[in-house]
Amino acid sequence: GLPSLGGEVSPDGTEFWGWEPLAWNDDFTIPYADPNSDQLPTSNDFDRDGDGKPDSWPTGWYNVDLEEYVWPGALRQGSSNSDLEIFFVTDDRTNREFEYYPFPGDSSRKGLGLEIEFRYYQWANPLAEDIIFLIYKVTNKSENDLHEVTFGMWGDPHIGGPSNWQDDLSYFDRNINMVYAWDEDGISDVAGRSPGYFGYKFLESPGQPYDGIDNDNDGMVDESRRNGIGDDGIPTAGDPFDPRQPGEPNFEWTDLDESDMVGLTGFASPPFTSQNRISNDHYVWENHLLAGEFDSANVDQAGDYIFIYSSGPMSLPAGEARRFSIALLVGQDYEDLTLNAITAQDIYEKNYQFAKPPDKPIVMAVPGNEQVTLYWDAEAETSYDLISESYDFEGYVIYRSIEPSFLDQQTITDANGSRFLFEPLKMATAAP
């Protein structure tokens, strides 16, 4: 990947003025990360140094009752919603650029007083293999209400590779809340490999529960995760007197779309110049985060452009949180990208409860005379699927490739002609 060049530092160059990771919550009772590790915590990490703990996890994730380290899942402890999850928390206390003090009792803690919890999800399932889900929970930890907040993302896509930045095109689709980019000449940094399409889709934009408007046109005004109202507009979800007994399965903070979402409200794609870097925050705010403005100039004129897409403005009172979820998408062409966007929306609306394969076995290869013998354990055969509530192992599939990413074996296509599945060398049905 490309290192970031847009972050802001103090005039003496000794401190980042922006978002920095946290190892603990404010009162040091909830661990977020291992301060001795330079890795983000991942759900499938291993214990490489032999201390009994996955290397990127903090020691505070040890559960004394279970006598094991437990992943802090969003919906259940000890389990991730996805095949791979990354979790971390940051805040903006080191942003000392402006004379604003969000914590009157602590003048050293600057920024806006915001904290962000990040969760990134990815599945190995072929339906979702071209999607990464980015979930952000933004909390106003300060003592001040924030009255005009816009949430968004700044990015610099290079479609075709790090050196292939001169001929990018970009556009947006408000109907599906997606912005996207592609390469004009279809030539990448890798000889013989054509670049595809890249996009971001708003699955969940922050909610505005105080304006008296039904922002997402779902029939409920000022919907939020804090008001006790269920998906039918009546505060009875999960209660024994709910006529839909046993009630709504996901409720309040466990229901991802239970908010009055305002949607994608702006998209700018200006040239990558020093003026438009994210460190020039005042200029970016005044010129590129304007609600209702959508830049369409770059659909025909190729160049080196950045992405700035946004949702807002809205209020963020002290102590409250807003959540937004984004799908990072890739596709062979625009049609494939759009199909992936629809798949992402479907997974999101199911609260990320998506089909998962059995756990992977540990495989050992033993070389022989013009042959290799493979041995593996029974981990896959005994894994339990929480979605189907069953042991759903069906068999083993072996793939063989001379290409590191196995792309030469991804020859099975879907109905649209997009490469979809790998062709196995050997299949064996071996249910326990």
Segments (PLM) and residue ranges:
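Extracellular/surface-associated beta-sandwich interaction domains
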Residues: 1-432
